[in-house]
Regions:
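A short acidic/basic microdomain associated with nuclease active sites
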Residues: 1-14
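A generic secondary-structure signal marking the coil-to-beta-strand transition
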Residues: 2, 30, 135-137
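Generic hydrophobic, aliphatic-rich segments that mediate packing or membrane embedding
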Residues: 2, 17-19, 63
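Residue-level detector of alpha-helix boundaries and kinks
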Residues: 8-9, 52, 124
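Metal-dependent nuclease catalytic regions and adjoining charged, substrate-binding loops involved
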Residues: 13, 57, 70-153
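Conserved catalytic cores of phosphodiester-cleaving nucleases, focusing on short active-site segments
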Residues: 17-53, 67
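Short, charged, amphipathic alpha-helix that recurs within catalytic cores of restriction-modification
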Residues: 52-71
């Protein structure tokens, strides 16, 4: 029997994190987690073309690894975590398996976040939080950051 879940919500009380995996497939008690990344042809070529100029994003790997950790907590095991890159310009698809060791890195990351938050809202770290400048437009704290930037903070 195969079960497929799209936008599967996971909540971890131990890590104090909530996330939505794009797809979770359970087949014969094996659990697979997928996160889908949509990119344009140029970004796809830079990542997968003959002369690869850009390595995969550690942030994307840690995102899907976090979903893997959460799935393992819910289902008791995890058999694979994957990033699916979809080229929106020509519909080409590339599936990459993420090393399950990244799950340990994700656990360490979320535990460090819990420690930081014990002392109040942590400061922003360029390249970490936010990982990319464009992420700011999706953040609940954007207006506060904009005010802080104007003050020189």
């Amino acid at each position: 029997m195969i079960e497929v879940f799209n936008e599967k919500e996971f909540i971890s009380k131990t890590l104090q994190v909530r996330g939505f995996a794009d797809t979770v497939i359970i087949e014969d008690s094996k659990v697979y987690v997928y996160d889908i990344k949509t990119i344009n042809a140029w970004a796809y070529k830079m990542r997968f073309g003959r002369s690869v100029k850009k390595k995969g994003s550690i942030h994307q790997e840690l995102q899907v690894a976090t979903y893997g950790v959460l799935a393992e907590q819910e289902y008791g095991s995890i058999d694979g975590i994957f990033l699916i890159y979809y080229n929106k310009d020509n519909s080409h698809i590339k599936v990459l398996e993420v090393d399950r060791d990244k799950m340990l890195t994700a656990i360490a990351f979320w535990n460090s976040i819990k420690v930081e938050h014990k002392h109040g809202l942590p400061a922003l770290k360029k390249g970490v939080s936010p990982a990319m400048d464009w992420e700011c437009k999706y953040c609940s704290y954007k207006t506060q950051c904009d005010k802080d930037k104007l003050k020189g903070e």
